[in-house]
Design a protein with these regions (language model features):
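A broadly conserved sequence feature marking short terminus-proximal activation segments
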Residues: 133-195
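A glycine-rich helix N-cap at a beta->alpha junction
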Residues: 105-140, 144
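Active/ligand-binding-proximal structured segments within catalytic/core domains
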Residues: 59-70
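Charged, often glycine-rich, active-site loop that binds/positions anionic groups
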Residues: 92-109, 165-167
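The substrate-binding groove and active-site-proximal loops of carbohydrate-active enzymes
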Residues: 16, 52-61, 116-128, 154, ...
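A short acidic, often aromatic-flanked loop/helix-cap motif at beta-alpha or helix-coil junctions
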Residues: 93, 155-160, 214-215
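Short, solvent-exposed turn/loop segments enriched in Gly/Ser/Thr/Pro and often Arg
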Residues: 86-95, 153
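Non-catalytic terminal extensions that flank enzyme cores
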Residues: 1-58, 72, 76-87, 103-109, ...
Length: 246
């Protein structure tokens, strides 16, 4: 990370203020909201997303690099406002297809649709396929010296850190649907839901309509292959022990 002294170098600041390079153009948009950093002094958050259904690749590198460039541009223009970069892994997503560049494809084929952290590691090294790819991501980013914090979706869901946000989604369900549905094609509208339940029968992530039963308790209802079931999407509620959604 650049030192505060380096960020305040007159020559650098002057160059940054007139630069037409896209990282500075993007940083200026953020500067309008936080000209001197966040009012409470906490770091401005930058975030990248990674889907660990495959190994990290050049696109992964590009996303982290682009975000880092905007982050550094913002730090320069703001005179050194604190920032942090989170590399977020969407490792609760269902496996959509078997990657071409991995061994033991037959093992993965049996787990199509399953959450990535609940699929065995075909390399036989980690707790799951997602854990393996998450480790490869960190190793990949570390090789290039990126300054980041790694966050796993599964860890956040299972620890209950997302419970308050999930309750907020359930409380405001219809308002969210009213915003999202007009943006989707008709086919996707028929199955869209702000949360994706996991089937108790097949253990696959489902894209089906969902009904809120109890927002505070985190209970939802959905069609699981012809059978209506109720399940909980929260981690910290007693009624959610053995929960099947995320």
């Amino acid at each position: 990370r650049m030192t505060d002294e380096a960020l305040r170098t007159p020559t650098l600041l002057e160059a940054a203020q007139v630069s037409k390079a896209w990282p500075f153009e993007e940083a200026r948009k953020l500067l309008k909201r936080y000209p001197d950093g966040k009012p409470d002094g906490s770091p401005v958050l930058f975030e990248t997303g990674y889907g660990p259904s495959g190994l990290p690749h050049i696109g992964t590198f590009q996303e982290v690099l682009r975000t880092t460039l905007v982050r550094r541009a913002y730090e320069t223009l703001s005179g050194g406002a604190p920032t942090r970069l989170v590399a977020f892994s969407d490792d609760m997503d269902g496996l959509r297809k078997v990657p071409d560049n991995i061994e033991n494809k037959g093992l993965l084929a049996a787990y199509l649709g399953h959450p990535l952290t609940r699929i065995p590691d075909p390399f036989g090294k980690y707790e799951s396929f997602a854990h393996h790819n998450n480790a490869m991501l960190r190793e990949f980013l570390d090789q290039f010296g990126f300054d980041y914090e790694f966050v796993s979706a599964s860890d956040r869901y299972n620890s209950g850190q997302f419970d308050d946000a999930l309750r907020g989604v359930l409380r405001n369900w219809q308002a969210i649907m009213d915003i999202m549905l007009p943006t989707l094609r008709e086919e996707r509208r028929q199955t869209y839901s702000p949360v994706l339940p996991v089937s108790p029968k097949t253990h696959q992530v489902l894209q089906v309509p969902v009904e809120v039963v109890d927002a505070e308790a985190g209970i939802v209802r959905f069609d699981d292959h012809g059978e209506m079931v109720e399940s909980c999407i929260l981690a910290a509620m007693p009624s959610c022990s053995g929960r099947s959604t995320g």
